[in-house]
């Protein structure tokens, strides 16, 4: 525990007494001005072996007491102060750094870990996944499915005009039967007439006319 005993020098006693002796300031204004100028001159700032003291300035009662630089206030061991203390330098450096970052819009880089995902790559992967899902998705709308099958079959057919209508229906029906279904709740309903029913109807009508 630091020694709480504090030695009071003669200068400290003189400064303390001058706080209560205001008669020297009541003579005239020139005397007060002269005292203030002399007390603020560098020659009136005394330094001891292990402390720095300041004599009475005469400016105010609070500034009249001699200030002694110690480690932990008035009580404690006297220490030498060579420049700004280390903790004050650290505080100033941190404040200056924050102000610099604020003015220049720069922030200290955060370390990247293996668990973190780059936002740009995340968006790219999501877009890729959506495109893949759209590619293999089978529509549940029968009209849309029939339209797709119809356009696919027409594009696969040659441009030969001799292709019959029954061949086109057979091709569409075979494609519709082989199309995969995502959900069993949506069975494929065949709204188009079958080839056999068309042929039978045609044959029946021809027999009636004959």
From Swiss-Prot:
As stated in the Swiss-Prot or TrEMBL entry, residues carrying the post-translational modification Phosphoserine are: 18, 39, 41, 57, 60, 178, 189, 192
Q: One Gene Ontology cellular component annotation?
A: cytoplasm
Give the originating organism.
Answer: Saccharomyces cerevisiae (strain ATCC 204508 / S288c) (Baker's yeast)
User: Which keywords fit this entry according to its UniProt record?
Assistant: Phosphoprotein
Disordered: where is this region? 33-58, 100-139, 177-210
Miscellaneous note of the record: Present with 1890 molecules/cell in log phase SD medium.
Domain of life the protein comes from: Eukaryota
User: Could you tell me what this protein is called?
Assistant: Uncharacterized protein YER079W
Biased segments, Basic and acidic residues type: 130-139
Q: Where is the composition biased (Polar residues)?
A: 33-46, 102-116, 191-210
């Amino acid at each position: 525990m630091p020694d709480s005993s504090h030695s009071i020098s003669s200068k400290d006693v003189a400064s303390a007494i001058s706080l209560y002796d205001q008669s020297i300031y009541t003579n005239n204004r020139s005397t007060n001005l002269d005292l203030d100028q002399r007390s603020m001159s560098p020659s009136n700032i005394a330094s001891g072996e292990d402390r720095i003291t300041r004599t009475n300035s005469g400016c105010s009662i609070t500034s009249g007491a001699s200030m002694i630089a110690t480690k932990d206030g008035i009580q404690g061991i006297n220490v030498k102060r060579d420049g700004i203390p280390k903790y004050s330098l650290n505080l100033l450096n941190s404040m200056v750094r924050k102000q610099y970052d604020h003015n220049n819009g720069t922030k200290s880089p955060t370390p990247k870990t293996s668990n973190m995902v780059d936002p740009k790559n995340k968006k790219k992967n999501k877009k890729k996944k959506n495109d893949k899902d759209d590619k293999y998705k089978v529509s549940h709308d029968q009209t849309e499915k029939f339209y797709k099958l119809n356009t696919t079959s027409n594009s696969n057919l040659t441009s030969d005009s001799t292709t019959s209508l029954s061949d086109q229906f057979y091709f569409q029906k075979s494609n519709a039967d082989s199309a995969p279904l995502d959900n069993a709740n949506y069975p494929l309903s065949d709204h188009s007439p079958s080839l056999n029913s068309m042929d039978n109807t045609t044959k029946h009508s021809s027999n009636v006319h004959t």
